[in-house]
Design a protein with these regions (language model features):
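Glycine-rich phosphate-binding loop
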Residues: 248
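Nucleic-acid enzyme cleavage-core boundary/entry regions
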Residues: 1-242, 251-365
């Protein structure tokens, strides 16, 4: 792993390169400015080398020639100053705390937390450094992981080796916000299953699915945090394990899968370390709703609109997704993971998952 002090110095050097650029611009009689990629669906392109979606060539120049742009650059200067101080003092803060700290910055204070969050993303893009290296973290923690995986966690009190099955309770090991502090030591796994809901995650653990099939189980906790996606990315890359995603059968859950496999518009600048392009979708598939006659609900207008939007989303531009989404629109139904319980509490682990994983070529027994 990279030396902590070297990483700190590298982060500071990249961060301070921004105000140095402004100083050079003003020394030449120019207005200070920054150039950023436009963060829209139209500027997302597929990178064949990395197999993830990234920002394209469309850029936006923000120059201090208007009050709005000048204020943005002023706020960025304050945030850089704050992060510099935080790194030097080996302190950390949440994104929420940063927003409240800005209350004392007079004209540079943020009107809403979303504004400060977006500015941090700007700094990530400009420096090619993750916010975790700025010692900034979100309010929410990463989710949980359970199964045959041994890790080493670096903390303020030193390092500690943890087995994510033997050394934790049935809630699993809680993924920290900064996954770079983890070293993956060894495993006895044949697959990774990322699970949307806590109920299904607990069902697989209670039924011993992790032991029977040597599976690492990861609770996504809904739309997964960056730390959770980073863990999946590392498990796929470092151990070359097949990663699968098991969600509810609705358009919002398909987007959870897409964020794991291909990345999102919001984090397209770090798709290479967050996305897992080899990740495959288990279900709940629209065809499962039909074939297993699962208890279901009618699609809402918002569901229908979201499904139609996904038909034009480049992340779903495959024959498989086109067929499944059109089938769901035809069925006009959606189902939850827990709907399999209608066939018994063991059905999902004894019948559905083994059959589905075998058909995908993930399970070979």
């Amino acid at each position: 792993m990279i030396d902590k002090e070297a990483r700190k110095l590298e982060t500071l050097e990249k961060l301070l390169g921004i105000p140095r650029q402004w100083y050079s611009q003003m020394s030449r009689g120019e207005l200070p400015s920054i150039t950023m990629p436009t963060r829209t669906k139209r500027n997302i392109e597929y990178d064949e080398d990395t197999e993830v979606w990234k920002y394209g060539d469309r850029e936006r120049l923000r120059e201090a020639g208007s009050e709005k742009s000048a204020l943005h650059i002023l706020k960025m200067a304050y945030v850089i100053w704050f992060i510099r101080h935080q790194i030097k003092e080996s302190r950390s803060s949440t994104l929420r705390e940063l927003y409240y700290i800005s209350e004392g910055w007079k004209k540079a204070k943020f009107a809403a937390q979303n504004d400060s969050n977006l500015l941090i993303e700007d700094l990530e893009i400009l420096t090619d450094v993750q916010r975790e290296q700025f010692n900034l973290r979100p309010e929410e923690d990463g989710a949980s992981i359970f199964g045959p995986l041994r890790i080493r966690e670096e903390t303020r009190r030193g390092s500690k080796d943890i087995h994510c099955g033997d050394d934790v309770g049935e809630a699993g090991y809680q993924i920290p916000t900064n996954v770079e502090k983890l070293e993956f030591l060894e495993h006895d796994a044949e697959m990774v299953i990322a699970i949307e809901t806590g109920g299904m995650y607990a069902r697989l653990i209670e039924n011993g699915f992790d032991e029977k099939y040597n599976a690492i189980l990861v609770h996504l906790k809904g739309q997964p945090a960056r730390s959770t996606r980073r863990v999946l990315n590392r498990l796929a890359k470092e151990f070359e394990l097949p990663v699968t995603v098991f969600t509810d059968g609705d358009p919002w859950s398909y987007r959870i899968y897409a964020s794991v496999a291909y990345g999102s518009i919001k984090s397209a600048h770090i798709s290479e370390i967050l996305a897992t392009p080899s990740a495959r979708f288990i279900g709940v598939q629209p065809s499962d709703i039909r074939d297993y006659d699962l208890p279901s609900d009618k699609l809402t207008e918002q569901d229908v609109s979201a499904l139609k939007s996904e038909l034009t989303d480049p992340r779903f531009a495959t024959d498989y997704w086109t067929e499944q989404i059109n089938l769901q629109l035809s069925l006009n139904l959606k189902s939850e993971q827990q709907a399999f319980a209608a066939r018994g509490l063991d059905f999902v682990t004894d019948e559905y998952l083994p059959a589905r994983l075998s058909s995908m070529g993930v399970l070979r027994r």
